[in-house]
Curated annotation (Swiss-Prot):
Gene3D superfamilies: Hypothetical protein (2.30.130.30). It comes from the Bacteria. This is N(4)-acetylcytidine amidohydrolase. Signal peptide: none annotated. Catalyzes the hydrolysis of N(4)-acetylcytidine (ac4C). InterPro entries: AC4CH, ASCH_domain, PUA-like_sf. Pfam families: ASCH. Belongs to the N(4)-acetylcytidine amidohydrolase family. GO terms for molecular function: hydrolase activity, acting on carbon-nitrogen (but not peptide) bonds, in linear amidines; N4-acetylcytidine amidohydrolase activity. It comes from Salmonella arizonae (strain ATCC BAA-731 / CDC346-86 / RSK2980). Keywords: Hydrolase.
């Protein structure tokens, strides 16, 4: 079985598959992805494969510069997005936005 290239929490799987979630915000450990990369996607909880995505763009962002567009692309409110990012990456301010589409 091929390993997954990137994982998402299971709660985001349906939003990814239906196109409601089109970005992911990651820390420096996942800043190496670039436009054109094709990635196998798995669930964080069990590493089970659920789709393949293509990276369509990347950019940097800070917790303070997250905006409504980021929130819409994550399919959540801006307050919820900031809370989720702060929970996943405590004490970090610099992040990497990965834009993607399901293949």
């Amino acid at each position: 079985m091929q390993p997954n290239d990137i994982t998402f929490f299971q709660r985001f799987q349906n939003d990814i598959l239906t196109g409601r979630k089109t970005i992911t915000i990651r820390d420096a450990s996942e800043s190496h992805f670039k436009a054109g990369d094709v990635l196998r996607v798995g669930r964080f909880e069990d590493d089970g494969y659920f789709c393949t995505i293509e990276v369509t763009g990347t950019s940097t962002v800070t917790l303070d510069t997250l905006n409504e567009k980021h929130a819409q692309q994550e399919n959540m409110s801006l307050d919820e997005l900031k809370r989720v990012i702060a929970e996943i990456y405590p004490n970090q301010m610099q992040f990497y936005v990965i834009d993607f589409k399901c293949l």
